[in-house]
Amino acid sequence: MSEYTLENIAQVVEILREKSPLTHCITNVVTVKDCANAVLAVGASPIMANAPEEAEEIVGISNSLVINIGTLTKEQIETMKKSAKFAIENNKPFILDPVGVGISNIRNQTPIDIITNSKPSIIRGNLSEIKAIAMMYDILDECTMAKGVDVAQCDIINKDTLISNCNLIKNISEKLNTTIAVSGPIDIISDGHDVYTIENGDAMMSRITGSGCMLGCVLGAYLAVTNPLEAAITGTLVMGIAGELAAKTARDNNKGTGSFGIYLIDELSKLNKSTILSQSKLNKM
């Protein structure tokens, strides 16, 4: 078990910019451009390929893989499954972002197939989505309903629910044998042994389409240069700090959510060690 310091995190941020690894993002059509720009902003190189015919070739040249089920089609599901299988067979790390799991049969079956047959390095989602996954593996014994890509009111992480939710996420992570990254007002990350919380971010991030999808791809970028727990911590922290700074710039200039989205990419591209050290709200539980 390791304890990750802000110095460690800052070093990972610098390593990513130096190495510029290729991150393959199979993501949804709503946010694909934003995701590609976010990956570029943190220093990696994105490729966004969907054809099943080239799945193995693209994964073969990539350093990490991101699978986001936001806008599923039969062809994309085939690509996702082939890519995940090939990634595992060739020791390529990948992250699964089960967007909206729990609201339809196809959104339930697709991540289950991927998790069962090709264990992801990281599963990222809001608390409703992660609980829905846990339900399908009988880790939770009472029903929970996902609210599309948004978190249900009963699943909002706050000071009152933090300890119980940290224990829950640690248990789910241990049972699934993968790192879990949960997004919320307070983010929770666990590898089944250690649990970290991050309190960076801004409410404005929930007012634009794609902030969660961008986070998944940013985590995927860091996954190319470090282990799953450190990648999840680094990516979540970087995205949260950038969100805070972008929101401040938007408010200071009397701008709205459209400008905020642009500022968010700006801040991701500008983030450096001094900002990480001064702005981070990272805690080990």
From Swiss-Prot:
Coiled coil (residue ranges): none
Pathway(s) where this gene product acts: Cofactor biosynthesis; thiamine diphosphate biosynthesis; 4-methyl-5-(2-phosphoethyl)-thiazole from 5-(2-hydroxyethyl)-4-methylthiazole: step 1/1
Highest taxon of source: Archaea
Cofactor requirements of the protein: Mg(2+)
Keywords: ATP-binding, Kinase, Magnesium, Metal-binding, Nucleotide-binding, Thiamine biosynthesis, Transferase
Record has Metal-binding as a keyword: yes
Reactions it catalyzes: 5-(2-hydroxyethyl)-4-methylthiazole + ATP = 4-methyl-5-(2-phosphooxyethyl)-thiazole + ADP + H(+)
InterPro entries according to UniProt: Hyethyz_kinase, Ribokinase-like
Binding of substrate, residues: M48, G210
EC top class, as a word: transferase
E.C. number(s) listed in UniProt: 2.7.1.50
Keyword Transferase: yes
BP terms from Gene Ontology: thiamine biosynthetic process; thiamine diphosphate biosynthetic process
GO molecular function: ATP binding; hydroxyethylthiazole kinase activity; magnesium ion binding
Binding positions (ATP): R124, S183
Role noted for this protein: Catalyzes the phosphorylation of the hydroxyl group of 4-methyl-5-beta-hydroxyethylthiazole (THZ).
Similarity comment text for this entry: Belongs to the Thz kinase family.
Protein name, as recorded: Hydroxyethylthiazole kinase 1
Naturally occurring in which organism (per UniProt): Methanosphaera stadtmanae (strain ATCC 43021 / DSM 3091 / JCM 11832 / MCB-3)
